[in-house]
Amino acid sequence: MAMKIRLARGGSKKRPHYAIVASDSRMPRDGRFIEKLGTYNPLLPKDSEDRIKMNLERVQYWLGQGAQPTDRVARFLEAAGVKEKAERKNLKKGEPGKAAKERAEKRAAREAAANAPAEEAASE
């Protein structure tokens, strides 16, 4: 059985509240779970103690049993000091898009054309 430690959404529309659960990866997101390990309330301020609550002993037990945390839960565990911080690489994140590259090329060509006659006139 492939285990995951993940978020199960609760709360009402536009008012999310999540339970941190250990569940079988084949079960639905909000469906059956094996154990509730904590809660996460994204509506609270980031510095609030009640924003993320976890039973770290049980989390470590499930990690020892081979449960894989999802990306968001892994970040929570890194912040709590349970898991080592994974290095993330978004190499394409900062790269400009296709249209921006084309605009930059056109701008560079225009500037080169504008500077070329001025340089020739200055050298004569």
Curated annotation (Swiss-Prot):
One example GO MF annotation: structural constituent of ribosome
Protein's recorded name: Small ribosomal subunit protein bS16
Family designation: Belongs to the bacterial ribosomal protein bS16 family.
Record HAMAP family: Ribosomal_bS16
Renumbered residue ranges of the record's region Disordered: 84-124
Entry annotated with the keyword Ribonucleoprotein: yes
Coiled-coil residue windows: none
Pfam families associated with the record: Ribosomal_S16
Protein species of origin: Paracoccus denitrificans (strain Pd 1222)
Low complexity compositional bias, start-end: 111-124
Bias-annotated ranges (Basic and acidic residues): 84-110
